[in-house]
Curated annotation (Swiss-Prot):
Belongs to the transposase 11 family. This is Probable transposase for insertion sequence element ISA1214. It comes from Archaeoglobus fulgidus (strain ATCC 49558 / DSM 4304 / JCM 9628 / NBRC 100126 / VC-16). The keyword DNA-binding applies. One of its GO terms (molecular function) is DNA binding. GO terms for biological process: DNA recombination; transposition. Keywords: DNA recombination, DNA-binding, Transposable element, Transposition. Involved in the transposition of the insertion sequence ISA1214.
Length: 322
C-alpha cells in the first residue's frame, strides 16, 4: 500500500485519536458471553496431554545420547529425574516440602530422594535437554501458526516483594522473562530469561524462535516495545502490531509499514493488536497456578525453574476463539 502523501508527526497523533475511539468499541465487544461449552470440550485435550506426559517424556529423552562419565553413576535414571522435576515444579513447594510429599507418593515414583537431590535437578544438563525436547514435542503435536503475541513480566526473589506492587520493577530482587505465545493455540513458542532487563529477555526469546526455525508471520507487542530498534528485529515479511508513541517525530521506512497497515484497516489492526492481551492473561494464570516467587539461588537454576513454568503452561493450554 502506498499512502500517496507525506506522513507527519501531526498525522500520527490524529491517527492515534481515531484508534482510541475504535479501541473503546472493541472493549465493549469483548464483554460478550464466554463460550463455556467450547472451553469444557477443549479441557479434554488437556487431560489427554496429562495422560500422555510420561510417553512424551520417554520420546524426549530417546534422542539424548549420554556419554559415560568418571565417578558414580546417578542413582535415578533420566526419565524419573525429568518426571520428578516436573512434579516438583508443578507443586510449587519448597524442596523440603517436596521431599516430604515424595514419602506419600513413593509408590508412584518408586524412589526416595533428599531435598538436595531435588535442588540439583534444576541444574541437571540432561534434564534441561529433555525439557527442551519436550517443549518442542508439545508444539509439534499442536502445531505452530506463526501468528504470535509477546510480553514480559518479572518474578520476585523475595517473598516480601511482588512484581505487580513494586513501582520500579528493577534491581536485584527481580528476574525478567519474556514469553511469546501462539494466538491460535495459546501455547508459548518462545522464552527468554534475564537478570538485567525485560528487553534483554525479549531478544533471547526471539533468539529461541530463530534457533528452532520458527517463522514469525505476525506479532503484537505493547507500547514498551514501540521503537524503531524493535521493528528492525523483524524482516519485511513480518507484520508487527505495535502502537506508535504520540511523540513520534522521525517516521522512517520501518514505522511507515506499521502506519500503512493502520490506515488500510484500523479496526482490523486494533483487533489483532489486542491479541497481546493473551500474553497478560497467560502470565496471570501461570502465577496463580505455579506461583510468582523464585526460590532457587543459582542463576541457571532460576532460569530452569521459569522455563518449566512455560512448559507446564503448554500442557494446560486451552485456547477458545471468540
Amino acid at each position: 500500500m502506498n499512502l500517496g502523501f507525506r506522513v507527519t508527526g501531526k498525522f500520527v497523533r490524529e491517527l492515534l485519536d481515531v484508534l482510541d475511539e475504535i479501541a473503546e468499541e472493541i472493549r465493549q465487544e469483548e464483554k460478550e458471553k464466554y463460550p463455556y461449552t467450547e472451553w469444557e470440550r477443549k479441557r479434554e485435550v488437556v487431560k489427554e496431554r496429562l495422560r500422555k506426559l510420561p510417553e512424551y517424556v520417554r520420546e524426549a529423552i530417546s534422542v539424548i545420547t549420554v556419554q559415560k562419565r568418571v565417578g558414580r553413576p546417578k542413582k535415578v535414571d533420566l526419565e524419573k529425574r525429568v518426571m520428578l522435576f516436573l512434579f516438583a515444579r508443578l507443586m510449587d513447594k519448597s524442596n523440603r516440602d517436596i521431599e516430604e510429599l515424595l514419602e506419600l507418593f513413593e509408590p508412584l515414583f518408586g524412589i526416595k530422594v533428599s531435598y538436595k537431590t531435588i535442588e540439583r535437578l534444576y541444574s541437571d544438563e540432561e534434564v534441561r535437554m529433555a525439557l527442551h525436547n519436550l517443549f518442542i514435542l508439545l508444539l509439534r503435536e499442536e502445531g505452530v501458526s506463526g501468528d504470535f503475541s509477546g510480553d514480559g513480566t518479572g518474578y520476585s526473589l523475595t517473598i516480601t516483594k511482588h512484581y505487580r506492587s513494586n513501582p520500579k520493577r528493577k534491581g536485584k530482587d527481580f528476574r525478567y522473562v519474556f514469553r511469546i505465545i501462539d494466538i491460535d493455540t495459546g501455547m508459548y513458542v518462545g522464552f527468554g530469561y534475564s537478570d538485567r532487563s525485560e528487553k534483554d529477555a525479549f531478544e533471547k526469546a526471539l533468539g529461541m524462535l530463530k534457533s528452532m526455525g520458527v517463522k514469525v508471520n505476525s506479532i503484537s507487542l505493547d507500547k514498551y516495545y514501540s521503537s524503531r530498534k524493535t521493528l528492525r528485529l523483524f524482516d519485511a515479511e513480518t507484520a508487527v502490531y505495535v502502537i506508535p508513541k504520540r511523540n513520534l517525530a522521525r517516521i522512517g521506512f520501518d514505522w511507515l509499514r506499521v502506519i500503512e497497515r493502520i490506515v488500510e484497516a484500523p479496526y482490523r489492526f486494533l483487533k489483532r493488536y489486542f491479541k497481546r492481551n493473551l500474553s497478560e492473561a497467560g502470565f496471570s494464570a501461570d502465577k496463580r497456578r505455579f506461583g510468582w516467587l523464585i526460590r532457587q539461588r543459582r542463576e541457571d537454576r532460576r532460569e530452569m525453574a521459569l522455563f518449566a513454568v512455560g512448559l507446564w503452561h503448554n500442557v494446560f493450554a486451552v485456547r477458545v476463539v471468540r
